[in-house]
């Protein structure tokens, strides 16, 4: 059975995992960097890259020990090659290249977004192509028709900020700390989601894309006014994001009747309110709803190893001179949408 070692270092998680072609996660480890970045209220790229340098090799050794295997037992090395913070991406990719060269194993350069896009198939063996994917994370917010490994059609993207970035900014504005997404979700549970009137950018419009910059600005003004309870403001913000995601996804579901399932992935997919709303939306379209377990939503090595396993099975490997890419769209044929191509 195929065994893939996956490495992930595109943002602020240093991770490695060993995954088999029949979906067994033999070992996985993730080292977060919350303590390093919390004083700054967000990820500092240079600090993140240096942390990856310090942590990746011990984590790789750890997963090999956990699984009771050596590099000789591995069939290929999969490493995130982009998109992401270029310093961190380079740490993981160079490590992957070195391991592949030293062990004489194939290298698989994985698009971080493809790692998220295929992660639901690691958790659910019944999920077949094609499926409609809402990919929602700190740096990306896209609707994609996933037609196969390496075959994606982008239906919508954000014209400005990603939903996850809006969560982090809101947490900072409200003094909730870092990481922002879980902090906002926790306090939102104590508030009234209808207490503060906030905009839902592009909701109801014919345009298929997302926008969160105006919502962020509205939260900033509401927070500065000092007239709103923090829990109410957090809950109202979260509900606005839910409404935006549901509205845009509704249009995509209507446009993709042949999609076999509606799938969500990415770090923001760990949010309970979002998962509940999307579950209800899928039911209205009579589609199965698939979401990875929470540990597979945030950045991890298992999703990179699984994407590597899927690509390896398709005969897709990469040369050792493959370059790291800070930007790498899953659908290179998709037209740029205002500022949307910056992060995708």
UniProtKB/Swiss-Prot annotation:
It is an enzyme of class 2 (transferase). Its EC number is 2.3.1.234. Belongs to the KAE1 / TsaD family. It is found in: Cytoplasm. Pfam families: TsaD (PF00814). CDD domains: ASKHA_NBD_TsaD_bac (cd24133). Keywords: Acyltransferase, Cytoplasm, Iron, Metal-binding, Transferase, tRNA processing. GO terms for biological process: tRNA threonylcarbamoyladenosine modification. One of its GO terms (cellular component) is cytoplasm. SUPFAM superfamilies: Actin-like ATPase domain. Transmembrane segments: none annotated. Binds 1 Fe(2+) ion per subunit. GO terms for molecular function: iron ion binding; N(6)-L-threonylcarbamoyladenine synthase activity. The gene is tsaD. Fe cation binds at residues 112, 116, 299. Required for the formation of a threonylcarbamoyl group on adenosine at position 37 (t(6)A37) in tRNAs that read codons beginning with adenine. Is involved in the transfer of the threonylcarbamoyl moiety of threonylcarbamoyl-AMP (TC-AMP) to the N6 group of A37, together with TsaE and TsaB. TsaD likely plays a direct catalytic role in this reaction. It catalyses: L-threonylcarbamoyladenylate + adenosine(37) in tRNA = N(6)-L-threonylcarbamoyladenosine(37) in tRNA + AMP + H(+). Signal peptide: none annotated. It comes from Sphingopyxis alaskensis (strain DSM 13593 / LMG 18877 / RB2256). This is tRNA N6-adenosine threonylcarbamoyltransferase. Substrate binds at residues 135-139, 168, 181, 271. Coiled coil: none annotated. The keyword Transferase applies. Its cofactor is Fe(2+).
């Amino acid at each position: 059975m195929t065994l893939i070692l996956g490495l992930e270092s595109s943002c602020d998680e240093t991770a490695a995992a060993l995954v088999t072609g029949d979906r067994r996660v033999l070992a996985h480890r993730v080292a977060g960097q919350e303590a390093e970045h919390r004083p700054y209220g967000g990820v500092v790229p240079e600090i993140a890259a240096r942390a990856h340098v310090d942590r990746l090799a011990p984590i790789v050794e750890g997963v090999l020990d956990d699984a009771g295997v050596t590099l000789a037992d591995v069939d290929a090395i999969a490493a995130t090659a982009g998109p992401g913070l270029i310093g961190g991406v380079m740490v993981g990719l160079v490590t992957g290249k070195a391991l592949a060269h030293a062990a004489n194993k194939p290298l698989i350069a994985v698009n971080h977004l493809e790692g998220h896009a295929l992660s639901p198939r690691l958790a659910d063996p019944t999920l077949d192509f094609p499926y409609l994917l809402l990919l929602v994370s700190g740096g990306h917010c896209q609707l994609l028709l996933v037609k196969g490994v390496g075959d994606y059609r982008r239906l919508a993207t954000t014209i400005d900020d990603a939903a996850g970035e809006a969560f982090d900014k809101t947490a900072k504005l409200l003094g909730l700390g870092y990481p922002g997404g879980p902090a906002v979700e926790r306090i939102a549970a104590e508030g009234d989601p209808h207490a503060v009137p906030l905009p839902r950018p592009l909701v109801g419009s014919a345009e298929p894309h997302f926008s969160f910059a105006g919502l962020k600005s509205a939260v900033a003004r509401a927070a500065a006014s000092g007239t709103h309870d923090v829990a109410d403001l957090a809950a109202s913000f979260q509900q606005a994001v839910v409404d935006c995601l549901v509205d845009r996804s509704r249009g995509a579901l209507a446009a993709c009747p042949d999609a076999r399932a509606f799938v969500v992935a990415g770090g923001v997919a760990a949010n309970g309110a979002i998962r509940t709303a999307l579950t209800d939306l899928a039911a209205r379209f009579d589609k199965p709803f698939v979401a990875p377990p929470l540990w597979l939503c945030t950045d991890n090595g298992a999703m990179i190893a699984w994407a590597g396993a899927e690509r390896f099975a398709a005969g897709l490997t990469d040369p050792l001179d493959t370059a790291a890419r800070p930007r790498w769209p899953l659908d290179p044929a998709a037209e740029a949408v205002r500022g949307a191509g910056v992060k995708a």
